[in-house]
Amino acid sequence: MSVTRLSFPYGESIQWHSPDQIPQLPPSPFREWLLASGSLTQKLKSHCNQFEVKVLGEAMLPPFPGELPHQGQAWIREVLLCLDGIPWVFARTLVPGAMMDSAQDNFLSLGTRPLGELLFTSGDFTPGKIEVGEFTACDSLAKLIDSLEQESHHPLWGRRRYFSHGDQQLIVSEIFLPKARQLIDRLA
């Protein structure tokens, strides 16, 4: 796996919808993974011997148009969540500048620790509803997937969730990579 020839950020603009607005969600067991209400980090950890976060990049950057309305800059962190050396999830986090002013230390000190541990254990964050999206990767995300040597035979699925911290909200988007879909489908 070599992502060094690519450049951060890798994410792309995705249309997200409430699960009840999607005419056909993927079949089980993948559907349960997509809609799991708890920590995806914990769910992933329970299915491997070694869990690893590979940080692809983090910086103050402008979000995609419509991704985080009314924000000029956001702290954006992109990571791969790997199970036993295999990248399963591409995750993109957007933290508004105002939230960074009040909670900067929480985020900048993460390193290779999963953000899910902070969001679900600190008591400072309240998870919101899950939105889902189905899409075909293009541009940077497609190049990232190619560099991971993962072939996609299906459109990609992802989920997005807002987490409240006081009167601010951050966004976490998690895209299930092709290998994850293949391995989850085998769990049936």
UniProtKB/Swiss-Prot annotation:
Organism: Shewanella loihica (strain ATCC BAA-1088 / PV-4)
A molecular-function term among this protein's GO annotations: chorismate lyase activity
Substrates-to-products reaction catalysed: chorismate = 4-hydroxybenzoate + pyruvate
Function: Removes the pyruvyl group from chorismate, with concomitant aromatization of the ring, to provide 4-hydroxybenzoate (4HB) for the ubiquinone pathway.
PANTHER family, sorted: CHORISMATE PYRUVATE-LYASE (PTHR38683:SF1)
Name of the protein described by the UniProt record: Probable chorismate pyruvate-lyase
One Pfam family linked to the record: Chor_lyase
Subcellular location: Cytoplasm
Annotated metabolic or biological route of this protein: Cofactor biosynthesis; ubiquinone biosynthesis
GO biological process: pyruvate biosynthetic process; ubiquinone biosynthetic process
Family statement drawn from the similarity comment of this UniProt entry: Belongs to the UbiC family.
Binding site for substrate: 77, 115, 174
Alphabetically ordered keywords of this record: Cytoplasm, Lyase, Pyruvate, Ubiquinone biosynthesis
A cellular component term, taken from the record's GO annotations: cytosol
UniProt superkingdom: Bacteria
Residue ranges that the Swiss-Prot or TrEMBL entry lists as coiled coil: none
Entry-linked InterPro entries: Chorismate--pyruvate_lyase, Chorismate_lyase_/UTRA_dom_sf
E.C. designation(s): 4.1.3.40
SUPFAM superfamilies named among the record's database cross-references: Chorismate lyase-like
